[in-house]
Amino acid sequence: MGMDRREFIKSCSLVAVMGLLFGCRKLPLDEVARLGDGPTLKQFEDEVKLAVSQAKKQLDLVKVSRPGSLSIPGASPVNRFGMAIDLDLCDGCGECILACNQENNVPLVPEDDAARGRFMHWVGMRSGAPFMCAHCGKAPCERVCPTGAANHTPDGLSAMVYKRCAGSRFCGANCPVQARKFNFNDAQKLGLARKFNKEVPLRDKGVMEKCSLCLHRLQNDRLKFKTQLSVAEGIGGASVKNASGNAAGNASEWRGRGVTTACSDACKRRAIIFGNWLDEESPLVQLTKDRVLYVPREIADLDPSVVFMRGRR
């Protein structure tokens, strides 16, 4: 018995729908990781504990003055973001590492790499304190990048454009403190990646990565500020507020007030302070005024934005 026209169209429609639902398109790896289960939180916690227990590297610190304006072309005259780590308060618990891993979707590593201490963590431990990229104002890593993937923002962050990275590893070789991490493994295919935070992309095999000072948080706050500014200008100059809810001093200038990093948020002892070195109202400036500041000797001449502090002047 033949199939009539209505039944034929119905069958074709069903086949088309089934194709769309069950495999007519291949999901990108990033989406697979987002939709899949991925490693458990406990696995990430266990890896951080292992990393902290293995940490043996020591810091050779030298005194420096407080970071000032950047000397790079196009630098912002009002913003230079950075951090200070209080060695008198830090107890080396490692909570900052776990918070960073979740915020930035830092993957796990295979067991043999973990046993050798080869982690992908953006925050490591040295001398019992958190250690990460110092976002140097004269960053040697940026100068040798052949594609411009390693670059400096006007606000003082040493940033990475992942899609532009060719994996030359020149930047990693030129970092005096080995703060950069290279993706030797395809963490997504190996089931080692989990997307905790939708705002940060998972990185591919062959890409370099490192601490970003939670650049996405700053970008979100800047966008919010500009949106509020546009609305305020449209209704006659209403006050513009930043992330902390406080009106900005100059209604047209974004200063990033109220923005924090994941590691700073996670520190129960308040040993990690994030802020703007060029803003006198920033907690970073207020809390470092009478402190002695230090940086690793290897980068003392590179104008780092992340410093350590201990004792008082």
Residues covered by each model-derived region:
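N-terminal secretory signal peptides and thylakoid transit peptides that target proteins
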Residues: 1-19
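C-terminal segment of N-terminal export signals and the immediately downstream linker at the start
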Residues: 2, 22-81, 296-301, 307-313
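Extended, non-catalytic scaffold segments that flank or surround catalytic motifs
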Residues: 7, 45, 110-128
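Periodic small-residue-enriched repeat registers in elongated scaffold domains
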Residues: 20-26, 149, 168-169, 271
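Ferredoxin-like iron-sulfur electron-transfer modules
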Residues: 68-92, 119-173, 179-261
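Classical protein tyrosine phosphatase
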Residues: 95-101, 170
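Short, non-ligating residues that shape and space the ligands of small metal-coordination modules
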Residues: 99-102, 106, 142, 181-182, ...
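Long, compositionally biased charged/polar accessory segments in the mid-to-C-terminal portions
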Residues: 216-313
